[in-house]
Amino acid sequence: MQDTLLTLDTPAAVIDLDRMQRNIARMQQRMDAQGVRLRPHVKTSKSVPVAAAQRAAGASGITVSTLKEAEQFFAAGTTDILYAVSMAPHRLPQALQLRRRGCDLKLIVDSVAAAQAIAAFGREQGEAFEVWIEIDTDGHRSGVGADDTPLLLAIGRTLHDGGMRLGGVLTHAGSSYELDTPEALQALAERERAGCVQAAEALRAAGLPCPVVSVGSTPTALAASRLDGVTEVRAGVYVFFDLVMRNIGVCAAEDVALSVLATVIGHQADKGWAIVDAGWMAMSRDRGTARQKQDFGYGQVCDLQGRVMPGFVLTGANQEHGILARADGAAEADIATRFPLGTRLRILPNHACATGAQFPAYQALAADGSVQTWERLHGW
């Protein structure tokens, strides 16, 4: 018998396929209009069918955050893979085996020490790894400062002179998650673009190759007014979107394709609470919206059709219990009448990547109400 939202066990991670396809089309059309290729970051879904939908729409290659992801997607037929986390030396043998099996795996570095480790291992094994240099364009995380030309060139020469393939530069404007106006997002997108292009030009001026200029975050990808000098964009969460993205202003709640199916399992009527079987083990501990203009607690409550129920959120969560209540703190007069025992609801997540990671599989919901199980990768 074909499952539906009424027959699935709860909690379950549900993908609204219509919403997902619209999100994919929106980003792909924007990148096509800008004349750059889209290399989606599959750490959001970690699911082969989701990545296949992105590829079918025109995406080229993928970005991963673990070598386990690289293994899975390579086994499923993807060869062009960027491992976008600085390479730890103990992972080099695994990276080597992937390349020896035909995976066009790219590595990244942001230090001379890491470049030396890759070059030494590569020479020892007779493997010319393709390596990109990570650029820090917003002070958010890792990377060589966009203005630190001496360090940039030292890394580039270590790789190039060590027999490795210097493939390009990349950056990620992660601070875009802290913004919420079109003007601020557009300004950061330009800073991201300009800083990465500047680094590429510095390498080229020094006689070093730099064919790829890769930028990306979902907010800046959707906000960029121009991408001159950029060859590709990496974005990930756009495939599902989430409440953090809604607060940033790059999507509406109605665009969020991932939700957690939950069941009402009890009430605390005097407090105006309904209790659901989706606690933080289902929603994750991510409270990203707490720092934004609208706090959605542990998630926005929707009805079974995915329609937002204004004013109701998960205000709290224990391991397996979610507390459904009014966001304004007022006690709902008759919570048990509004949300009877056994009621099924869908909860939109703060952070799609974190919520997806709580589940071994997605339930892919088609327009006709049927559901298919899509496996999801777990762990490292």
Swiss-Prot record:
GO terms for biological process: D-serine catabolic process. CDD domains: PLPDE_III_DSD_D-TA_like_1 (cd06812). GO terms for molecular function: ammonia-lyase activity; D-serine ammonia-lyase activity; pyridoxal phosphate binding. InterPro entries: Ala_racemase_N, D-amino_acid_metab_enzyme, D-ser_dehydrat-like_dom, D-ser_dehydrat-like_sf, PLP-binding_barrel. Monomer. Catalyzes the deamination of D-threo-3-hydroxyaspartate (D-THA). Also exhibits dehydratase activity towards L-threo-3-hydroxyaspartate (L-THA), L-erythro-3-hydroxyaspartate (L-EHA) and D-serine. This is D-threo-3-hydroxyaspartate dehydratase. It comes from Delftia sp. (strain HT23). The gene is dthadh.
